Amino acid sequence: YTLSLHDALPILVILERQLARVAEAGFTCYVHPEIEFYLVERDADGRIRPTDHAGYFDHVPGGTAHEFRRRAILMLEQMGISVEFSHHEGGPGQNEIDLRFADALSMADNIMTFRTVVEEVALQEGCSATFMPKPFVGRPGSGMHTHFSLFEGERNAFHDPAGQYQLSATGRAFIAGLLRHAREITAVTNQHVNSYKRLWGGDEAPSYICWGHNNRSALVRVPMHKPGKAQSSRVEYRGIDSSANPYLAVAVILAAGLKGIEEDYELPAETEDDVWLLSDVERGALGIGELPTSLKSAVVAMSGSDLVADTLGENAFEFFLRNKRREYRAYDAQVTDFELGQFFPRI
């Protein structure tokens, strides 16, 4: 997994270097991703369509999705990758498999292996798997909501029994770092032009920079605390999508959170409302900003980021920016079926 640029750091080493910084601060990081994807097939005309018409948590024994998940999980477990949960997601043909918490570097490796396993098992089932963030108009996008915990030795550094929502000052500062640097890191966590159709397509995808307690419209969610589960205290970053490079995405997320801890960022007030239902004026009054609306705007935000440049290293940083600029310029040059349908008949 190396960049094709002379002297660029291997992608894995970028994460290793960030984890060394986390360790220098006295922490160990554990990660738990919820990985969404679609199972698709081609119809008689060659058009891509979902393999089923099921919905959220549908369970049809003997169906393609059920058998697929059973076989995929069995293969993952045989390879030493532990699965926490699996279920059918909200879109037709959409599935989710959640991997059990592991240290950040092992989890990045596991995610890469996971994708290969899912694609292989899908082919064995006579279909294909796609981790494309938004493959269908009007259907939910595929995210990779990722939970983070920092430990100091055997103690969860995000837990404080006296804190609001059992969240420690360390956890609050970590969230504050994620929020302050969210725009800068979005090009890495959402690296394709298609990623922004998910972020701004509704269906519980986060578009606005805020946090909340069990608020699924927020960019950062603090899950409900369960009594007796102090070691499970965690922070969920909901922006990242299923196409992200896990080594780079985890590295920049940790860099943002660690910056918040080191500089003791103050956490803004939580958002209790569904952010999508608020007006622009209401969001403005609450100080809630927007994530980038396109890859181009995300690249502009990243290009001025000392934090991302320091995390990736100069060569990888510049390579990434050049690569993404080529991508959005190639995309912008396309004339789409939508444009032809809208304008060709009447202009």
Language-model segments: which ranges?
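Glycine-rich, acidic/polar active-site loops that bind/position phosphate-bearing ligands
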Residues: 3-4, 8-347
